[in-house]
């Protein structure tokens, strides 16, 4: 129950010792990725906000009747309309896949089209000579093109930052140098999630000694049953609250069995794939990364 999860996190945070100092309270850019792994309502709010800000046309001087950019305007409007439909149909359940890739391919094509239009401007400028009206039209088209271009650029940047692949494959590996606040970040996120009533377990690399990680995890939380039964009930809690339960392990590189993670981590991720309402976050010191993290874990297991 909630009490078990709360006790686990409190014990782990206490065991972080001097590495955990609540006053620093990390609110780094990394913290938002935990919402992404867990697919929390806050993640979806950010997703809607980021995309919505681009969907809302800010300029009333669109140039849909322009010979030069009218077609681009109509393609832009079509993509925006389809994005609006896709957002209204977005399935927020933890086991659903977020797939906006075909729309993003169209955005990419639009950017290419925009570059082609931009190239044509140069020849148009040289042929306008002295005709003021033509020149005014050309300048209005160019100003609008710049605006579309800037909006598209910010939108694609914001979209990248949503890390949709991580929301679909909830396995996050945090790599950082010693003392950069990894333990603090995990402790902070775990405590805050528990306060918010979100299912969270936090283990330390040093918790994993002789036994397998399966028995370590089940015995630490006092679960009677197999590891798969434990995952099944943890998964069920995630499904009930409507965002993923998070399993977090800080400092995989610490503890007597650290190098065993090189063989085991892929196996753990593989077993989690059957439980879509569980996300995994692990941290590792950068200097031990290659010793502890399996080769190709990003491509083979979809980890970020």
Pin down the residues of each PLM region.
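P-loop NTPase signaling cores
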Residues: 1, 98-304
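Walker A/P-loop-proximal flanking segment of P-loop NTPase domains
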Residues: 2-171, 242
């Amino acid at each position: 129950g909630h009490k078990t999860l709360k006790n686990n996190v409190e014990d782990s945070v206490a065991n972080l010792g001097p590495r955990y100092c609540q006053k620093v309270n990390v609110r780094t850019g990394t913290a938002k990725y935990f919402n992404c792994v867990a697919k929390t309502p806050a993640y979806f709010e950010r997703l809607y906000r980021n995309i919505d800000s681009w969907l809302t046309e800010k300029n009333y001087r669109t140039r849909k009747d322009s010979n030069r950019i009218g077609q681009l305007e109509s393609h832009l409007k079509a993509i925006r309309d389809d994005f609006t439909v896709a957002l209204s149909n977005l399935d927020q359940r933890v086991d659903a896949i977020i797939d906006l890739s075909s729309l993003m391919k169209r955005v990419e094509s639009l950017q290419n089209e925009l570059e082609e239009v931009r190239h044509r401007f140069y020849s148009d400028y040289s042929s306008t000579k002295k005709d003021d009206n033509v020149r005014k039209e050309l300048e209005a088209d160019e100003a609008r093109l710049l605006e579309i271009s800037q909006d598209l650029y910010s939108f694609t940047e914001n979209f990248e930052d949503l890390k949709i692949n991580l929301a679909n494959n909830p396995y996050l590996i945090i790599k950082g140098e010693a003392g950069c606040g990894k333990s603090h970040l995990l402790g902070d996120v775990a405590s805050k999630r528990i306060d918010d009533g979100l299912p969270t377990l936090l283990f330390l690399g040093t918790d994993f000694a002789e036994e397998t990680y399966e028995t370590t995890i089940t015995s630490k939380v006092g679960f009677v049953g197999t590891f798969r039964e434990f995952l099944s009930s943890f998964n069920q809690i995630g499904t009930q609250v409507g965002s993923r339960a998070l399993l977090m392990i800080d400092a995989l590189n610490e503890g007597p069995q650290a190098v065993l993670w090189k063989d085991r981590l892929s196996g753990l991720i593989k077993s989690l794939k059957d439980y879509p309402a569980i996300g995994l976050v692990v941290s590792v010191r950068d200097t031990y990364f290659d010793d502890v993290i399996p080769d190709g874990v990003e491509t083979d297991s979809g980890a970020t």
